[in-house]
């Protein structure tokens, strides 16, 4: 059944099992030729890893960015092929969206082996969870959402994250736009607030004793 499920059924954080005060940075809706390189530059400058939940059609169009993500030590994860609302999709379409996206990622970079999946818009159903699990993908939501996609201002993004972050938190940020909104991303200023906020957030989190890690491998 393609029925909505409660978020309690989906991984939203990883707790503090190791006592290391881990935090996980994740980026949705890329790779984008204007914005993703800037995000990668900031991550490289601060020597921290992130997980990029990429859209398959964009991975196919920007394989060099997928290769750069992997070369620089980041994880590339599955955000479906075309970013539909999966609650409106039949089981066969969900299957195609998930598996085709993983295939596109591997074609872009054979070293990229997706281990995690995030549903577009954070809308989860029983069919989505079942399809992800069958494909060997751990379903991952988030626990901290500064709504950077709405461009609320750099200070707002930073303050929202720092106010909500806890050990084991999964932070949601964006390095692109979903299909249909590409016109919003015509140059490198489109996600400028996210990039600038990230440059503040990483040292601020570290000063608070948090360690930024890749998402744990559950499969």
UniProtKB/Swiss-Prot annotation:
SUPFAM superfamilies: Glycoside hydrolase/deacetylase. This is Chitooligosaccharide deacetylase. It is an enzyme of class 3 (hydrolase). The lineage of its organism: Bacteria, Pseudomonadati, Pseudomonadota, Alphaproteobacteria, Hyphomicrobiales. The gene is nodB. Belongs to the polysaccharide deacetylase family. Residues 21-213 form the NodB homology domain. Is involved in generating a small heat-stable compound (Nod), an acylated oligomer of N-acetylglucosamine, that stimulates mitosis in various plant protoplasts. Its main location: cytoplasm. The active site is at 28 (proton acceptor), 174 (proton donor). Pfam families: Polysacc_deac_1. It comes from the Bacteria. PROSITE patterns: NODB (PS51677). A divalent metal cation binds at residues 79, 83. One of its GO terms (biological process) is carbohydrate metabolic process. InterPro entries: Glyco_hydro/deAcase_b/a-brl, NODB_dom, Nodulat_NodB, Polysacc_deacetylase_ArnD. Its EC number is 3.5.1.-. Keywords: Cytoplasm, Hydrolase, Metal-binding, Nodulation. The keyword Cytoplasm applies. GO terms for molecular function: hydrolase activity, acting on carbon-nitrogen (but not peptide) bonds; metal ion binding. It is found in: Cytoplasm. The record marks 148 as: Raises pKa of active site His. GO terms for cellular component: cytoplasm; membrane.
């Amino acid at each position: 059944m393609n029925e909505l499920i409660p978020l309690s059924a989906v991984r939203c954080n990883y707790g503090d099992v190791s006592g290391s005060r881990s935090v996980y940075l994740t980026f949705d809706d890329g790779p984008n030729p204007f914005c993703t390189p800037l995000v990668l530059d900031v991550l490289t400058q601060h020597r921290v890893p992130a997980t990029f939940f990429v859209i398959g059609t964009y991975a196919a169009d920007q394989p060099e960015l997928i290769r750069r993500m992997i070369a620089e030590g980041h994880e590339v994860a599955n955000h479906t092929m075309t970013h539909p609302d999966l609650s409106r999709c039949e089981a066969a379409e969900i299957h195609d969206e998930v598996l085709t996206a993983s295939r596109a990622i591997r074609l872009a970079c054979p070293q990229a082996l997706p281990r995690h999946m995030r549903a577009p818009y954070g809308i989860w159903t029983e069919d989505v969870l079942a399809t992800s699990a069958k494909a060997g993908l751990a379903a991952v939501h988030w626990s901290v959402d500064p709504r950077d996609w709405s461009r609320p201002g750099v200070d707002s993004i930073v303050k929202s994250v720092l106010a909500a972050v806890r050990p084991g938190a999964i932070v949601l940020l964006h390095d692109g736009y979903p299909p249909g909104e590409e016109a919003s991303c015509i140059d490198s200023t489109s996600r400028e607030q996210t990039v600038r906020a990230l440059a503040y957030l990483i040292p601020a989190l570290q000063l608070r004793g948090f360690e930024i890690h890749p998402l744990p491998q559950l499969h």
